[in-house]
Amino acid sequence: EIIGDIPIYMGYDSADVWAESQYFQLNEDRLCEKVAGVPPDAFSDLGQKWGNPLYDWDTLEKDDFSWWYRRMHKSAQLYDVIRIDHFIGIVKYYTIPADMPDARQGEYCMGPGKKLTDVINRAIGDKKIIAEDLGVSVPEVNELLEENNYPGMKVLEFAFGGDRKNPHLPHNYTQNCVVYGGTHDNETLMGYFIEHPDWELGYAYDYLDTRDKERMVDQVFRAAYGSVANLVIFAVQDILKLGNWARMNTPSTLGTNWKWRMKKGELNDSHIKDMRYLASVFGRENS
């Protein structure tokens, strides 16, 4: 199956914003006075100012969210599973003054919530959704996920801070979730364990029952595969046990992002055998 990753927002220079500007928060000169992003979080102390135009949800609703219907219907023709990035933004979205240098001085506004997910469900038919629900915990988001039976996400690199109730720890998972070692915005697993000091990794050492960095990655695989989660996804960089030089993206930076490529032969029969073995042990083979 192919999972298509759908960003919630459009680029300012996209065909959609140019051709259907009535659906976006633009002034009479077609400029953004406020833009999209997220407040400070685990990824960035300054937050993330993405700079995308915000949706004019009132206008979209008056048109029965037809633009979103067309978007999701087309995505369902291309992909088997659709991952909606920043799903929280459907419930409430963060607005940042366009002239601010970072995302610290923004505010939240309410989004369409169930009105939009009803349209999405009609548009995609029998295709499946993964909701990227990371970030600030919002009760309304959890309610919307349950109502639509959308699986949310768990990230193992977020698991070892806090206490034993951390929702990203495998023993706290519910079945209807998708587990990642890290997202495209995270360090690689090997990079995470190498770069972070012992005082940050104390609970990880205990939970994974080892201090050996390479074995810690193996133990993360086992913890995820052995959990009740319906689906487990690891980046190929983690299967190859590469350091942070191979990470996909560092948020709020420019330069080396999205440039890593896997070389021919780098993923070999030994890697495939190991992952197939884990799938067999924990009953995750393809049926």
Range-by-range predicted roles:
Residues 1-10:
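Conserved, well-ordered alpha-helix/loop/beta-strand core segments that scaffold catalytic motifs
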Residues 9-233, 237-244, 250-265:
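Alpha-amylase-like alpha-glycosidases and glucanotransferases acting on alpha-linked glucans and related
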Residues 260, 277, 281-287:
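Domain-scale activation on soluble regions of proteins
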Residues 270-278:
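Membrane-proximal transmembrane or re-entrant/amphipathic helices at the cytosolic face
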